[in-house]
Amino acid sequence: MADQIQEILDVPREFLKDGIQFIKKCQKPDRREFIKISQAVGTGFLIMGAVGYLVKLIHIPLNQVLVGGA
């Protein structure tokens, strides 16, 4: 019984230990890396916005034809 409890308690300890090791290895991105990531995210936003706009642009007239003016 005590072994089972010990095994259950070991899981959070190992998780915490691994998490601390991971945080210690992490580092902040330098300026060049940050700018590159920001540009990639911005490009993604623009592309997704354009796709959404085009879908809406096509959907509204198509909906008017199929459903009629409500």
Curated annotation (Swiss-Prot):
Extracellular side: 59-70
Side Cytoplasmic, residues: 1-39
Primary residence: endoplasmic reticulum
Keyword Transmembrane: yes
Gene Ontology annotations of biological process type: post-translational protein targeting to membrane, translocation
Subunit structure: Heterotrimeric complex composed of SEC61-alpha, SEC61-beta and SEC61-gamma.
Sequence intervals crossing the membrane: 40-58
Annotated InterPro entries: Prot_translocase_SecE_dom_sf, Translocase_Sec61-g, Translocase_SecE/Sec61-g
Localization: Endoplasmic reticulum membrane
Gene Ontology terms for molecular function: protein transmembrane transporter activity
HAMAP family per UniProt: SecE
Function: Necessary for protein translocation in the endoplasmic reticulum.
Pfam families assigned: SecE
Keyword Metal-binding among UniProt keywords: no
Family that this chain belongs to: Belongs to the SecE/SEC61-gamma family.
Membrane topology type: Single-pass membrane protein
Keywords tagged on the record: Endoplasmic reticulum, Membrane, Protein transport, Translocation, Transmembrane, Transmembrane helix, Transport
Gene3D superfamilies per record: Preprotein translocase SecE subunit
GO CC entries: Ssh1 translocon complex
Protein name per the record: Probable protein transport protein Sec61 subunit gamma
